[in-house]
Amino acid sequence: MTRILIIMPALNEEESLPATLKELREVVDEHDILVIDDGSTDSTADVASRAGAVSAQLPFTLGVGGAVRVGLHYAQRNGYDRAVVIDADGQHDPAGITALLEALDHGADMAVGSRFAAGTDDYPVGRTRRQAMRFLGAIVRALTGQRFSDVTSGFRAFDRPVIELLAREYPVEYLADTVEALLIVRYAGFRVDEVPIRMRPRAAGVPSTRRVNLVINYLRLLIGILGSASRRARLRKDEA
């Protein structure tokens, strides 16, 4: 039987977790759920444990990338065949997990849930952010030769070889955890497929990035992509 781990990074999500975990259990009750409490100041970890999930508490906030890396380390050490990363705030519809896993069944090594794929382009995004996302998508296409409609989506599934890779290589910087990870996987020679998903409003709570200057962070990401070219080249060399 294929062992699958659901990885859920969470920062101060005590309000949204009960409904999110309940809905998740209705879809994937047979899979293990790991909630990574990313230095929360509320009762996120306790709520996760009471709901039957495995809870890992970080002593301070690492950010989504750091939390996901912890989850991938856990999956690697405990022999999971596949891992799925999903938000704790309820914006990712757990029903999308089925499509992500089916993509792996059909040969993908990694599957990305796209908010902007055909038939799902109804996710509200501000003009500046949308333009920045398109620009990043163009960079990824230039570097990998593959077109992606949503390079910053955090709703993803990984097969075992990619778990092994990203458990040691997963970026921890904000936004790099999605875009740079995608580049790392493609440069290592793995196949990445997109599947359409739908996003929903948060179940509760306040977005942790509400006050983040997205323009500055996108510029930092661009600099990071340019600065990490040697690491990706090493991965491509290792694959060859």
Q: How would you label these PLM feature ranges?
A:
Residues 3-5, 180:
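Cell-envelope/extracellular polymer assembly enzymes that use nucleotide-activated donors
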Residues 5-9, 57:
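Short hydrophobic beta-strand elements that form part
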Residues 13-16, 40, 93:
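Donor nucleotide-sugar binding loop of glycosyltransferases
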Residues 37-45, 90:
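A conserved acidic beta->alpha catalytic loop
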Residues 80-91:
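Short beta-strand-to-loop acidic/aromatic patch adjacent to the donor-nucleotide binding site
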Residues 147, 170-173, 182-200:
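Catalytic donor-sugar/metal-binding loop of nucleotide-sugar-dependent glycosyltransferases
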